[in-house]
Design a protein with these regions (language model features):
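A short acidic (Asp/Glu
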Residues: 95-107, 128-137, 207, 212, ...
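Catalytic or ion-translocation cores adjacent to nucleophile or general acid/base/metal-coordination motifs
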Residues: 113-169, 331, 343-344, 359-428
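Substrate-recognition/cap regions that form aromatic- and gly/pro-loop-enriched pockets
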Residues: 303-304, 312-363, 370-371, 380-389
């Protein structure tokens, strides 16, 4: 694709189709639907009776986590059972970021169309604090028009090597003032949050999003509950102890672990991959003082312990049995990588993952890795196998569906105006998806990735 040419939606879908992209098939089947009808397609669940015990187990684990963290919400757990889906499009960020706001507005609208009162969003808190430098991007940076807004007084040098979950604790929000001091929204936020100290950055963002999300709930009737990768770690810990699930074998059985990781590496290096990154870690990240370390896992020569080594230099970081591994996950010393995160949240729970452009083909590659591994060395029972390899485990949702909307119309849904938001929802819900999605520019980087991957081969 010529880097100077912006392809039409039809051209984009054709090129994605040539890559056998799941994203192309999804959109082709959805484009002619009005948005309010597309919600039903997006949230549609496969008829797999085996999902019920796994889904109930997820709901129980979610209930326990919410209770432990002081956020008990039985209605959310009931909503998950009614409509097994979660939104996973977000990096850690607050709802004043346009993309994050639109992701969660879309999710809330979709759930509301099915009369579901609560939805669950998992934000990726293992994201780097600085993801781009010109202009600065990351979870602690916003833009208000052309004015930069910082959410922390930490310097760029302090943030450079950190992941969001590695920010200093306790954590204090410090919202810088845009040049326009008359902006009541920023003034109100500074008054509300700048004096407060939180246990950690993740808790700060959850508190802010819970408050800002009231506007979405007011407009749709469905409330979004925000969690982060600490919940994914908690879920992995619970699944390690569940004999009905294969996770413990995947981690502790040296032969099986090596098989899965080798197939994963081969898949990432293959022609089929234009979505997965090349930073390889053995299932987990180890949380050091300033950053997340990539791991290499080995079995001890005696006993059932694992040796966790820093991948870059072989330094031994820990020796762990199953119980100690569980404690490290629960204590926040270990985080799941992207592959394992999807495995514990969606592959073995019955939940559909709603997310962004790259997720749609990433999940297919992850399924391929697991299917090839299970074919060569059977480690799944039949109910889990049926659940893991079900169709439509993921679906595109969120901000991409708003790309074709006039920017002035998007500007009208200012966070301070619930009336504007309600009017916006009424305006768009009867429009066809193809009218809303525009040229679908958010996926053009995937086409460029495919070209680069082909050149590298």
């Amino acid at each position: 694709m010529d880097s100077k040419t912006v392809p039409t939606l039809g051209e984009t879908l054709k090129q994605l189709g040539m890559l056998q992209s799941a994203l192309a098939q999804q959109l082709t089947e959805t484009l002619e639907l009005p948005l309010e009808q597309a919600f039903g397609r997006i949230l549609k669940q496969p008829a797999i009776t085996e999902s019920h015990p796994f889904l109930n187990s997820f709901s129980d684990n979610l209930n326990e986590y919410l209770e432990q963290t002081g956020k008990k919400n039985n209605a959310l757990c009931d909503s998950i059972i009614q409509c097994p889906a979660m939104q996973q499009a977000d990096h850690s960020g607050i709802l004043l970021d346009d993309e994050i706001f639109l992701n969660n507005l879309f999710f809330s609208m979709a759930l509301s169309s099915k009369n579901i009162p609560y939805g669950l969003t998992i934000q990726c808190s293992t994201v780097k604090c600085i993801s781009a430098r010109a202009p600065l991007k990351g979870p602690l940076f916003l833009k208000d028009g052309n004015q930069p807004v910082r959410l922390s007084d930490l310097s760029n040098s302090q943030l450079k090597s950190r992941s969001f979950c590695n920010l200093p604790t306790p954590f204090q929000i410090s919202i810088s003032a845009p040049a326009d001091q008359q902006d009541s929204r920023w003034k109100r936020l500074r008054e509300m949050w700048n004096t407060k100290t939180f246990t950690c950055a993740e808790d700060a963002f959850i508190a802010i999003n819970t408050e800002l999300g009231k506007q979405i709930k007011y407009a749709t009737g469905t409330e979004i509950v925000f969690l982060d990768e600490r919940f994914t770690s908690f879920l992995a810990a619970k699944q390690l102890l569940n004999a009905q699930l294969p996770l413990a074998d995947m981690i502790f059985d040296a032969t099986l672990r090596s098989l899965i990781l080798n197939i994963k590496e081969t898949t990432i290096d293959s022609d089929d991959n234009f979505v997965l990154g090349h930073d390889l870690t053995d299932f987990f990240y180890f949380k050091s003082e300033q950053k997340l370390e990539l791991l290499a896992i080995e079995n001890c020569t005696t006993g059932a312990e694992l040796i966790l080594k820093r991948r870059s230099d072989g330094t031994v970081l820990a020796r762990v049995g199953k119980r100690e591994l569980v404690r490290m996950l629960e204590d926040g010393r270990l985080f799941c990588d992207r592959f394992l995160g999807y495995f514990v949240r969606c592959f073995g729970t019955g939940l559909k993952a709603l997310g962004g452009t790259s997720q749609q083909d990433s999940v297919g590659l992850y399924q391929s890795i697991l299917r090839k591994s299970n074919t060569q060395l059977q480690f799944m029972n039949t109910p889990f196998e049926n659940l893991c390899f079900r169709d439509e485990l993921t679906f595109l949702a969120g901000a991409p569906f708003f790309e074709g909307i006039d920017s002035s119309l998007l500007d009208s849904i200012n966070q301070s105006s619930t009336d504007n938001l309600g009017s916006f929802i009424e305006l768009i819900k009867t429009r066809k998806v193809k009218q809303l999605i525009g040229n679908f520019q958010s996926c053009h980087y995937l086409l460029k990735n495919a070209v680069k991957n082909k050149e590298r081969q």
